[in-house]
Amino acid sequence: MIGKFIVFEGVEGGGKTTQIELLQDWLLETGESRQILPKSIDLDLEVVITREPGGTKLGKALRELLLSPDVLAEKIQETSELLLYAADRAQHIEALIKPCLERGTIVLCDRFIDSTIAYQGYGRGLDVELIKQLNYIATGGLKSDLTFWLDIDVEIGLARAKSRGNFDRMEQANIEFHRRVQQGYQELAKNNSLIVRIDANLTREKVQQQIQAIIMQKLVEWKYI
């Protein structure tokens, strides 16, 4: 595939949505001024933002089930939750991500397979190896070209999330759950060189500067410039 798949990960309140939007704007501006297109692609630069769950029509329905506290009158069991995320991902890959990458698009995705390992594996306590196998089935082995882990103090992140308004079902989990999720991201980053830690405790401008510096290096490595 000739496009690039860039994922943003992290606990609640890390600013993923803001940073993705800022990066999209910067990439498009940089593309216009520096002609950052591989020589094999004779197209205008396209940068698409998506998210998990919720990147497709099916995904939006699953997102409502997974994250809205009042949709279901019963508790979603941990294994059911895991399988719903996998269903969202399988649809997302085939309906949106693969077609975008095949036509040379840069895809910026808010959460991917590492979220499932961190939240359902470390957070919920489900078998991490089983989750990895399920992720492989859902993705067909597709991995990100680069993952940014927006690392923020858990308490600060939850306070930021709370300031936005109503908590979703994940944000309502207790602090110990979120600390376990953070531990999951720490372990993932230790063992995967494609995961780049970004200090998300800083201002959004400084966070974006860190991201752009890494992306500029990658654009050279990927022969975009």
From Swiss-Prot:
The keyword RNA-binding does not apply. The keyword ATP-binding applies. It is an enzyme of class 2 (transferase). CDD domains: TMPK. ATP binds at G10, V11, E12, G13, G14, G15, K16, T17. Keywords: ATP-binding, Kinase, Nucleotide biosynthesis, Nucleotide-binding, Transferase. Phosphorylation of dTMP to form dTDP in both de novo and salvage pathways of dTTP synthesis. This is Thymidylate kinase. It comes from Trichodesmium erythraeum (strain IMS101). The gene is tmk.
